[in-house]
Amino acid sequence: MDKLLLRGNGPLRGELRISGAKNAALPCLAATLLAREPVRLCNIPHLRDITTTLELLSTLGARVLVDGQLGIEVDPRPVHSVVAPYELVKTMRASILVLGPLLARHGSAEVSLPGGCAIGSRPVSVHLSGLQALGAEITVEDGFVKAQAARLRGTRIVMEMVSVTGTENLLMAATLAEGRTILENAAREPEIVDLARCLSAMGARISGAGTSVIEIEGVAELHGAEHSVVPDRIETGTYLVAAAMTGGDICLKRTDAGLLESVLLKLKEAGAEVTTGADTIRIRMKRRPRAVDVRTAPFPAFPTDMQAQFMAMNCIAEGSSVVTETIFENRFMHVSELQRLGADINADGKTAVVRGVQRLRGAPVMATDLRASASLVLAGLVAEGETLIDRIYHLDRGYEVIEEKLSALGADIRRISNTRSVA
């Protein structure tokens, strides 16, 4: 099993291209199942979750072509199966996103209950109750969600909780429903706006994406299209925090500052100089970061996917901070690993108090989920000595060649296959 070895190595400096957003690419890949013609998606990151999704589409019968220019073409016409098997679904929660498209396009779907990061229950009830409101018959048996409907019928759906994947699933299903669907209490994330753009390019009629009320006028069929997914705002934020922690000066290209305003505000509060351009963000940190309080909430508030990274920064910041997680339970699993590096953190329920220390010290640590693993990488960049991070397959699910990108900025980081290669 691969590991990452880091040695604290001073400020990060240089330029970096940001990858396409995994959380935009995954629903767009699922949306290709709705079409009657091939769909081409561009700016797709090379990640484990993307590979798993492509395997799932192929298992369903779709023809998948991958080129060397971050492009993927999916031809859904040969799809012959509506069963998403456990072997693929168990590793990735986003696989539930094929439920709506398969049901809407083929009249039935069987999707194994999903797996993924162990950061809370993330119930699929929002997906199921919404599809039932659209006229689907749904049962859950033998670990599978089984759904059937001759044709879905548009209706008004008030979502019981704000759910990104729930909004995406219902949005996709409603594009082929008969009549108008209104989604209320919908999630507002940029990745949902991007999915709506993709669906609209395929012929869907959607308004209100990016607000809490989305209206979809169902159409008889969707055609082929080409769509480029948005930049990854979480990858962007992660590298910005890395620069802030190391006292660096980096410029990120092919990104969008408008997608992470709450993160940029917190970085400025921490003392960073942030300059934005049309598709660039430059950050310079000339001092030890100031501790900043963080409270996660649905977009446009501070994202839960940046909580662990800011906790890592607060570990070496000047002063004390309070980090509050309101989205998921069990999302402080990185705390004990940061403590192994010398962090002063007291976590209780959904709140953690972080007291900044002068320095962290390297140690063996273990990643528990995607963003927790990112926080350990950030901590390793500033820790004295060597930090060895185990179970980095979590990291590979969401960050494209992170060791190569950080190395290009001057970090001392490398991937190793086993600890025996470290002397």
UniProtKB/Swiss-Prot annotation:
Task: Indicate which residues the UniProt annotation says bind phosphoenolpyruvate.
Answer: K22, N23
Q: Cellular component terms, GO, for this chain's entry?
A: cytoplasm
**What's its EC?**
2.5.1.7
Copy the pathway line from the protein's UniProt record.
Answer: Cell wall biogenesis; peptidoglycan biosynthesis
Q: Where in the cell is it found?
A: Cytoplasm
- Write down the top EC class of this protein: transferase
Q: Which residues bind UDP-N-acetyl-alpha-D-glucosamine?
A: R93, D305, I327
Q: Name one Pfam family in it.
A: EPSP_synthase
Q: Which PANTHER family match?
A: UDP-N-ACETYLGLUCOSAMINE 1-CARBOXYVINYLTRANSFERASE
Write out the similarity annotation: Belongs to the EPSP synthase family. MurA subfamily.
The protein's job, in short, is: Cell wall formation. Adds enolpyruvyl to UDP-N-acetylglucosamine.
Q: What is this protein called?
A: UDP-N-acetylglucosamine 1-carboxyvinyltransferase
> What species does this protein belong to?
Acidithiobacillus ferrooxidans (strain ATCC 23270 / DSM 14882 / CIP 104768 / NCIMB 8455)
